Amino acid sequence: MVSSTDTISASFVSKKSRSPETSPHMKVTLKVKNQQGAEDLYKIGTHAHLKKLMSAYCTKRNLDYSSVRFVYNGREIKARQTPAQLHMEEEDEICMVMELGGGGPYTP
């Protein structure tokens, strides 16, 4: 028969032996850089959706969320992606780019 003390200590050991990469409470600091070179730092959970970071950036910079794009390693970030899914590490850089409108035919 296993005592409750043994169960608790076994549970404690399994939590301690987890690797930091799989911890749901781990956070990473990410840098968001705009086209003018201005940088902002954001701390976010590795398993939190990046929409939180993107919305916070747009609110801080007074930008319309639908008019900007966020790019990491040459690919657009989707709102429901997480830093863990994109293998982001401390101080990684996300580029914010303004979406260009237009593209219609030229009429003089």
From Swiss-Prot:
GO terms for molecular function: protein tag activity. It is found in: Nucleus; Cytoplasm. Keywords: Cytoplasm, Isopeptide bond, Nucleus, Ubl conjugation pathway. The keyword Nucleus applies. Stress conditions rapidly and substantially elevates the amount of SUMO1 and SUMO2 conjugates with a concomitant reduction in the amount of free SUMO proteins. The SUMO conjugation system plays an important function in stress protection and/or repair. InterPro entries: Rad60/SUMO-like_dom, Ubiquitin-like_dom, Ubiquitin-like_domsf. GO terms for biological process: protein sumoylation. The keyword Heme does not apply. Its main location: nucleus. Residues 26-103 form the Ubiquitin-like domain. Residues 1-25 are annotated as: Disordered. Belongs to the ubiquitin family. SUMO subfamily. Pfam families: Rad60-SLD (PF11976). SMART domains: UBQ. The gene is SUMO5. This is Small ubiquitin-related modifier 5. Residues 1-14 have a biased composition (Polar residues). SUPFAM superfamilies: Ubiquitin-like. GO terms for cellular component: cytoplasm; nucleus. Interacts with SAE2, SCE1, SIZ1 and MMS21 Covalently attached to a number of proteins. Disulfide bonds: none annotated. Gene3D superfamilies: Phosphatidylinositol 3-kinase Catalytic Subunit, Chain A, domain 1.
